[in-house]
Amino acid sequence: IAAGCGSKRDGLTITNVSYDPTREFYEEYNKVFADYYMAEYGKQIKVIQSHGGSGSQARSVVEGCNADVVTLALEHDISLIENTGLIDAGWKDEYDKDSSPYTSTIVFLVRKGNPLNISDWDDLIKDGVEVITPDPKSSGGACWNFLAALSYARDKNNSEDKQKEFLGKLYANAVSYTHLT
């Protein structure tokens, strides 16, 4: 989710405060953006990157980190900044798809040869399957994993109880939470 914040400046150096997994993406994207900016405006632009956990980055902006752009993992992280007045209310409505500039894909990694024949979400709730996933309380990406599982459960079951049952079984099979932040 992206949003502009901070004051406008005459300089051509901007700071993008973002979350960890976007570091390499923005290293490449900033080169393309600088070329575009030069072609469009005839001026050079430099983008300074700041990366960390999405929630930590949001708090750093609230506490005074000078961000021209924030590209954080979760809506509530940007809303935290909005609540301080650093971002105008209604930022979500400024662009398509709730101002989310990118999406994510969930991938299942399995043991060599896929001995448990895992191919879909339902396979992850079977007895004997061990799931390793980041703790949804620890990172934006982990929340995306949870939301992907919830979306699957909702598509499959109209019953909220069945959805909760699916999620309960999935996380009961989580033998380890990895912490990404």
Predicted features, each with a name:
Residues D161-A174:
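Extracytoplasmic surface signature
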Residues T178-T181:
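Conserved small/polar residues in nucleotide/adenosyl-binding loops
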